[in-house]
Amino acid sequence: MNIKKKLSKALTNTVQFFANELSQSATDRDGEKKTVTPGMPELLRRAAADGAVMLENNGILPLEGGTRVALFGITGYESHYVGYGSGGDVNRPYAVSFADGIKNCDRLTLDPTIESIYREWNKKNPINNGFWGHWPFYFPEMPLDNTAVENARNKNEVAVAVIGRAAGESRDCKLQKGSYYLADDEIAMLDALAEEFDNIVILLNIGGIFDMSWIEKYKKVIGAILIVWQ
């Protein structure tokens, strides 16, 4: 191996070490001081609302005050917060999930039973967020109990289903289920909801390309679809 190849290999190994071993998610930053710039949370909330893309609305949005909401999907409780990659893989000071956001909204009521079921599942099946270039493309879904879904239908006006994806630098989207396409467990979740609910709001917690052909299958029960980004 000549000197140029040796130098190139050494440089590559060094870059990979710092990228993979010393990325934000792989280093221990618990002891570091995390600050919140005054006014920034309010600005980001406005930016998130203004940046949401409504793909479909069959008259269900905006939800009326007092609407009772059953929130489904692991990502509704363990959300994707970053854009992934050098500029997006951030060490956030705090995070607000979709479930937390609904509970913070005084106009809506989150179904506590469904929330409890998901919270308990997440405790027993904690999410592995991976590390640089090895983030999970999606969070595997919890199998839904048909009786729980039926009970939720009887107590709530609308079901909200959150579907999330992770893709970015060093972790490109793949043409496979659980990445570009819906995973089988996500299809099972939507099938269960479609059996009981007449209005389902779909929130897409994504930051890149995503197959949307599945909309045709559920068009009779989809009340709205929003891309809410990450």
Task: Mark where each language-model region is.
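C-terminal non-catalytic regions of proteins with extracellular/luminal or membrane-system context
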Residues: M1-Q230
